[in-house]
Amino acid sequence: PSIRYHDNKFWVFFCTPKEGLFMSNAVNPSGPWSPLHLVKKVEKWEDPCPFWDEDGQAYLGRSRHGAGPIIIHKMSADGTRLLDEGMTVYTGPVAEGTKIFKKDGYYYLSIPEGGVGTGWQTILRSKNIYGPYEKKVVLEQGSTTINGPHQGAIVDTPDGQWAFFHFQHHHALGRVVHLQPMHWENDWPVIGVDFDRNGIGEPVYVCQKPIESKTIFAPQTDDDFSTPNLCLL
């Protein structure tokens, strides 16, 4: 799924293999959330990402099961309908998981390629949401033990800091979430640390948090099921 903040609401879009593309929104991320809305009944779509431009136009990026291609649709401003059949803007090796971001006139598509455990992170950029797009590999496993790195998204903070949110595949642990340091050079994101100076960043395990908090929360790790509510919630 993708979660975005627009028009004073949080929006979540996701696909299921056989049922289609769904949307829900909420003023508060803890809910209540609107009833699921079926945007389009369709099979084998995946990784949808909504995007609202400054001019009020709305779009949706997505891919297909089997990894790719990357397709952009025009979408109604209320997120309830797709307005066309979509345009393919990129085809690559196992290209999927697109996340759309705009900065300084550039549209950026963050896409993983090469497979969940063996791939890398690519950024596409263009002055037009339909392309043509320039391509740059911005993050790879390299000499680290953080494979993938997969399904990344650009994150900005209210005070102007930047970070990159992604996961790695870790067998029994599943998909382990990481937050990488990020800054901009020549209108390209620079992510992690370029240890071997090949122009491509590598993930790090330790970095300065973009937002500091002195409050430490320990996640719930067990439940004795003594009440009607789950402790994990």
Language model features with spans:
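Carbohydrate-active catalytic/glycan-binding domains of CAZyme proteins
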Residues: 1-233
